[in-house]
Design a protein with these regions (language model features):
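Short acidic-glycine loop/turn motifs at beta-strand connectors
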Residues: 59-61, 130-133, 139-144, 149-152, ...
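C-terminus-biased signal that marks the final domain/tail of proteins
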Residues: 1-2, 10, 16, 106, ...
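Catalytic cofactor-binding cores of redox enzymes
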Residues: 109-145
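A short, structured loop/turn motif at beta-sheet edges
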Residues: 59-61, 94-102, 206-211, 252-254
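Structural recognition of the beta-strand scaffold that forms the well-ordered cores
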Residues: 2-4, 64-67, 127-129, 137, ...
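A contiguous strand-loop segment
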Residues: 1-81, 109, 114, 307
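Proteins synthesized as precursors that undergo proteolytic processing into mature forms
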Residues: 79, 83-115, 120, 212-219
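Short, surface-exposed beta-strand-loop junctions and turns on beta-sheet-rich folds
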Residues: 9-11, 71-73, 143-145, 263-267
Length: 307
């Protein structure tokens, strides 16, 4: 089971991998009423130059999460549930859930608490997947959590608008059965990227091998890359696009991470089975921005102070 995402952002996110073994005591970093827990599973996350703010990751059970920007997000009003900060929320799910269903149950019991990071209160929605092929999307609209799971298609996600509206837009295009509809759009805006990704995912050939499957999925996700210097058209005038800083692809079945970093140009992978997730093992890190990273890099991780 494979899943891939692009990280499109207007500023360098200092992409850094962190390896967390199981058995670590953690805090939700959400102020009064923060959750406390001990990690049940090991994980690898992509942090923004810090182990306390991650946007992507996978655990040893094959559960993955991804945070993507969603303009218009309105988080829930703080209530009595134990809180977990936005930067820690993905780690919290990976630490405690083996699959999508368990992660969704946790999200009902523990509240995501927004926080400012590098001067910005980030509006995000979350995609999660597991090794069985189950997936879900979680959005925060009108101060309520909305979950797309089961009957709702959750195999593609970009940015705004919300997923329900994105799915409605698909009916405007010939690729999705509208004989009088539009051809595939070529812009870099989120709707155009959502339509293209949905279309190409439908037409990918059945792979004859795992390497073929990985190559096919990379070929599809690269069609949604935003080039550096791109602009987003709008009635009010073009605005600068957010270039693709990196692409991650997770093999949820075999616990492997494939990573393509744009600047500096790095293309490498991580075999999680070569990492030590045992209780008492050190937390490790590896910057994805070290020039010249190639091949399998699990041996390049170094210890880092945590808490």
């Amino acid at each position: 089971m494979l899943v891939a995402r692009n990280m499109d952002l207007a500023t360098d996110d200092l992409a850094t991998f962190y390896v967390f073994p199981k058995g670590i005591r953690k805090n939700g970093c959400a102020g009064t009423g923060s959750a406390n827990w001990t990690s049940k599973y090991g994980s690898v996350v992509v942090g923004a130059g810090t182990p306390y703010y991650s946007s992507d990751g996978i655990n040893t059970k094959g559960l993955a999460f991804h945070c993507l920007y969603l303009y218009g997000t309105e988080y829930e009003t703080r209530d009595q549930r134990p809180g977990v900060s936005l930067g820690q929320y993905g780690e919290f799910l990976l630490d405690n859930a083996a699959n999508v269903s368990e992660a969704l149950n946790l999200m009902e019991q523990f509240q995501l608490v927004p926080e400012s990071f590098v001067g910005t209160l980030w509006p995000i929605h979350i995609a999660i997947e597991d090794a069985s092929g189950d997936s879900a999307v979680i959005e925060f609209v009108n101060s309520q959590m909305t979950v797309y799971h089961g009957a709702a298609p959750t195999t593609v996600l970009t940015n705004e608008p919300t997923l329900d509206i994105q799915l409605q837009y698909l009916t405007y295009y010939t690729y999705f059965g509208n004989a009088n509809g539009y051809p595939l759009p070529g812009d870099v805006d989120p709707v155009s990227r959502f339509v293209r990704a949905s279309a190409f995912l439908l037409t990918l050939p059945k792979p004859s091998s795992l390497p073929d499957a990985i190559s096919y999925l990379f070929s599809a996700i690269r069609c949604e890359v935003e080039p550096f210097g791109s602009v987003v058209p709008s009635p009010a005038g073009a605005s600068p696009g957010w270039p693709t800083l990196w692409t991650s692809l997770y093999d949820l079945t075999n616990k492997r991470i494939y990573f393509d970093h744009t600047v500096p140009r790095n293309d490498f992978w991580i075999n999680m089975k070569k990492l030590n997730f045992s209780k008492g093992a050190r937390v490790l890190y590896l910057s994805a921005e070290i020039p010249g990273l190639k091949g399998e890099v699990s041996g390049l991780f170094k210890p880092v102070s945590y808490r």
